[in-house]
């Protein structure tokens, strides 16, 4: 048996949400009552910190490179079609398809740092469901903690994964 550990971290600046039309995604779930939006270029609006951190950790654990290649059409082996915004909900599913032949996910530990004004309790179950479906794992495999960030103008996610190489039959 070969076990490997991966670490992924994603951090973005956020700002108060001024208009209802802006979407705020965390863990594959649109946070409809969000008090924030990402404070960066709209072309990078597919920035779901949980998905990107977990994907990065999985790519690192399996020695397949940087999880950021998911958004880079020039370097990726996971081709994107069209607008990256529409691809965001499939980041984890695409990552899983890339690693599933050789690796089994034992567990994922996620720490989400988001200002306390944004209540996440109502969304935790939906985030668990999304991650479990995308990665074909059970809820017992995931641990999700939410805490206050040091900088109230940032959202960040730290993900640690443990994977096991699958034996060839």
UniProtKB/Swiss-Prot annotation:
InterPro entries, per database record: MECDP_synthase, MECDP_synthase_sf
UniProt superkingdom: Bacteria
Protein name per its UniProtKB record: Uncharacterized protein MG459 homolog
Pfam family, one: YgbB
Native source species: Mycoplasma pneumoniae (strain ATCC 29342 / M129 / Subtype 1) (Mycoplasmoides pneumoniae)
GO terms under biological process: terpenoid biosynthetic process
PANTHER family according to UniProt: 2-C-METHYL-D-ERYTHRITOL 2,4-CYCLODIPHOSPHATE SYNTHASE, CHLOROPLASTIC (PTHR43181:SF1)
UniProt GO MF annotations: 2-C-methyl-D-erythritol 2,4-cyclodiphosphate synthase activity
């Amino acid at each position: 048996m070969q076990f490997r550990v991966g670490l992924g971290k994603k951090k973005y600046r956020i700002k108060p949400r001024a208009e209802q039309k802006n979407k705020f995604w965390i863990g594959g779930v649109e946070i409809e009552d969000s008090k924030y939006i990402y404070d960066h270029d709209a072309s990078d609006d597919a920035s779901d910190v949980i998905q990107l951190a977990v994907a990065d950790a999985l790519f690192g654990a399996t020695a397949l490179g940087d999880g950021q290649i998911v958004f880079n059409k020039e370097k990726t082996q996971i081709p994107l079609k069209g607008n990256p915004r529409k691809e965001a909900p499939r980041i984890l599913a695409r990552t899983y398809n890339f690693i599933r032949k050789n690796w089994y996910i034992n567990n994922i530990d996620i720490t989400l740092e988001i200002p306390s004004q944004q209540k996440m309790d109502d969304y935790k179950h939906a985030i668990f469901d999304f991650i479990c479906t995308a990665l074909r794992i059970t809820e017992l495999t995931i641990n999700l903690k939410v805490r206050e960030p040091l900088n109230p103008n940032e959202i960040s996610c730290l993900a640690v994964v443990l994977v096991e190489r699958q034996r060839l039959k």
